[in-house]
């Protein structure tokens, strides 16, 4: 081999190895647009740059006043919650219309108040 070709290959290999970034095994500990790492729900919110709401429904509420499947998914899957709220917002559904819809779906008063607060927070977040 010629020396310039050998030198070129060596430099290419060294540069490619040095510039490769390892993602690591712990994806939840990765840095998201900041210097510090995150290990809580803030990571999902910052990564998506979206709305996140924590519901105050406990185990007894699930037993005595079970949520319909759609609202269970909205409570447990933040992306589903954002999608449904965006659909409501683009369909010009007001908060009162949303409450009427939840009443027709058979949600308990506590669940309605939780989802109403979440929808109001979403509308405020979206501006």
Curated annotation (Swiss-Prot):
Keywords: Secreted, Signal, Virulence. Residues 1-20 form the signal peptide. It is found in: Secreted; Host cell. Induction: Expression is induced in presence of citrus root extracts or during the interaction with the susceptible host. Its main location: secreted. A motif (RxLR-dEER) lies at residues 30-48. One of its GO terms (cellular component) is host cell. The RxLR-dEER motif acts to carry the protein into the host cell cytoplasm through binding to cell surface phosphatidylinositol-3-phosphate. Secreted effector that partially suppresses elicitor-induced cell death in host and enhances virulence of P.parasitica. Belongs to the RxLR effector family. This is Secreted RxLR effector protein 3. It comes from Phytophthora nicotianae.
